[in-house]
């Protein structure tokens, strides 16, 4: 089932799945951790991410990492992916 969010000031809709993929790719590609504010700023004014959608995407990404060798963590300056301690010796 596809979840759509409509911004009250816009005719554009963003799918939560797409928001999640954008957030994941942005954090993965960033040379330093990204804050929530920086992630929201990635979305243009004519197609903004709905309030709460970035936080939801981060939560979903963190859960999806449960069975992976990486984790999405929050540090002082924002969010980043890092290798989990349990597999660190092999990487």
Role assignments for model-derived ranges:
Residues 1-12, 18-19:
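Phosphate-centric recognition/catalysis
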Residues 21-25:
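Pre-recognition alpha-helix immediately N-terminal to the DNA-recognition helix
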Residues 26, 42, 57, 75-78:
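Short acidic/histidine-centered micro-motifs embedded in hydrophobic/aromatic stretches
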Residues 35-42:
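A short acidic, leucine-rich amphipathic alpha-helix
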